[in-house]
């Protein structure tokens, strides 16, 4: 999965849908689709709140760079209750099992996927 070199550093809440992953050093780069539509998923709510820099990317694939607890093997969901720049993980597979709801990871950057 490629990504644009012009990174979009996030400082606000936003909504992410499911996506794939790949490992990049000690961080996990998650390829996800951005949406600003309200939705309900099986593992928890996905709330709207897309910041201005990514509104034009609605429905498109982006690459999300987060600090890594472990390699992401499932999907990330972000809560509307999340603090700025932090992902609230409702559901996440890792090599050592599922991380519990409410687990957070620091969001580093978001890129438009190539």
Regions from the PLM with identified roles:
Residues 15-18, 35-49, 55-114:
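Extracellular jelly-roll beta-sandwich "head" domains, especially the C-terminal globular C1q domain
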Residues 1-42, 46:
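Extracellular receptor-binding modules and their adjoining Ser/Thr/Gly/Asp/Asn-rich linkers
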